[in-house]
A protein has these predicted regions:
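Beta-propeller domains
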Residues: 1-127
């Protein structure tokens, strides 16, 4: 989520999702999902999804707000994806408003990054 909304009413959550293999069995995290949690009471939450691929496993998504952003989802979602087929990791950058359009940028990292637990984006530069 946009951490500027921590402790406040917010609408959007970005999550790692499992790709459904069948009605019962779920797989590992292979999808980036954006949920709009603000529909009317009793209505289903709206979602946008991006599937990374058969042997691609994502880590926790991180929201990085645009410095000039106004809306809650004015920013980017950063996701490290481990591609088991290539034994490489990629950093994918998504426009937070349009997850379903796919990444706006992808950087292949020199090394394979093992799955991490949690991450956080800070607007402050620490020297």
């Amino acid at each position: 989520m946009n951490h500027a909304y921590t402790g406040k009413k917010y609408n959007y959550v970005y999550a790692a999702g499992a790709a459904v293999k069948d009605d019962v069995m779920w797989g590992p995290n292979q999808c980036l999902v954006k949920f709009n949690t603000a529909p009317e009471v009793g209505a289903k939450a709206e979602e946008s999804v991006w599937y990374f691929g058969e042997r691609c496993f994502m880590q926790e998504p991180i929201f990085a707000r645009k410095p000039t952003g106004v809306d809650e989802d004015d920013g980017y979602v950063l996701v490290v994806v481990n591609d088991a087929g290539r034994d490489k990791s990629d950093l994918h950058v998504f426009d937070a408003k349009k997850i379903e359009d796919g990444p706006v940028a992808t950087v292949t990292l020199e090394d394979h990054l093992p799955p991490g637990l949690h991450g956080y984006w800070s607007d402050v530069v620490h020297a």
